[in-house]
UniProtKB/Swiss-Prot annotation:
Keywords, comma-separated and alphabetical: DNA-binding, Homeobox, Nucleus
Compartments where located: Nucleus
Annotation: DNA-binding region: 30-89
Pfam families per the UniProt record, alphabetical: Homeodomain (PF00046)
Keyword Magnesium: no
Name of the protein described by the UniProt record: Homeobox protein HD-8
An example Gene Ontology molecular-function term: DNA binding
Major site of localization recorded for this protein: nucleus
Gene that produces this protein: HD-8
GO cellular component: nucleus
Keyword set includes Lyase: no
InterPro entries documented for this protein: HD, Homeodomain-like_sf
SMART domains: HOX (SM00389)
Source species: Encephalitozoon cuniculi (strain GB-M1) (Microsporidian parasite)
Amino acid sequence: MRKNDFDVREMNAALGILKLAREGRGDSDEPDTRTRKTTFQMMVLKEVFKIAPHPSTLTKADLALMIKLPLKAVQIWFQNERSRKERGGRLGKRTRGGKSESIDPVRLFKVIMKVLEKNREGLGF
């Protein structure tokens, strides 16, 4: 077995555990409130948007778990970002009304690690 295969299985197992933990919480009856995103979360969202302006529901759910945001906040962020880009004319015709794209959780993790490294360099760690 290759080392990379083990990493993928390990990542999928960890993601499964996070999903089970989130399922147990359920939706509350509290009114929706605006979710404040950290600089790190915003950087990750922007990097993922560069790869997939229309991520699949599963990709958004995985991303939400990985960066500790509610799924609804991630869905709304992508919707708003596409709208901003379309208004500014910066979203190509290929991406307007495009099909949803799935991103492998390992690739998402690599994007997050890349942003983390950039953050560390900027903060002088």
